[in-house]
């Protein structure tokens, strides 16, 4: 139903001005910066790892601090307790407007609207990463095709409501409608990709 893309952020006073500068420093010493995350198995962390990997960084040596929520990691960044955080744009928009943070790159397929319109995508920086925390609805096992169709129609109607469209705007989400079959294909593909990366990081065991 929606895609939530993630941005790499540092404090406004950070000496790191660009994503390229961040990658250059981390290639020399991967443990230089402390990154905040809410889960080392979540897509916000894994998308960051993918960017670092493609940027030539020894990503297994990154310094990571785990928090219980995106807002907590954001506060830690603002307070100077961590150096960077890769998080949803909705967590950072007001801080960017206030001049408190700098967003270096976003993992979206194209540039996002204000206040992020001047922020390059990872792809623009020749780092081929597009990843989102997508929003959808899961049904119970055993739903009949007719029941699945009922919910597909109902949820499409929800997506046409002013309330849903306002949620998209407020959270910097991007609307994306796929049916149950396509959603399952995406789920399976992302599961395999995540499993491979988590195994590479030593977080899970290979099956």
What does each of the following model-derived ranges do?
Residues 111-129:
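Small-residue (glycine/proline)-centered packing/hinge motifs flanked by hydrophobic/aromatic residues
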Residues 18, 80-81, 100, 126, ...:
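Conserved functional loop/turn residues at catalytic and ligand-binding sites
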Residues 103, 145-207:
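An extracytoplasmic/periplasmic, membrane-proximal ligand-sensing/linker region
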Residues 1-72, 122, 134-167:
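Hinge/capping helix and adjacent helix->loop/strand transition within the periplasmic-binding protein
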Residues 64-75, 88-91, 181:
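Short helix-initiation/N-cap motifs at beta->coil->alpha
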Residues 45, 49-56, 83-117, 195:
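A ligand-binding cleft/hinge motif common to bilobed small-molecule-binding domains
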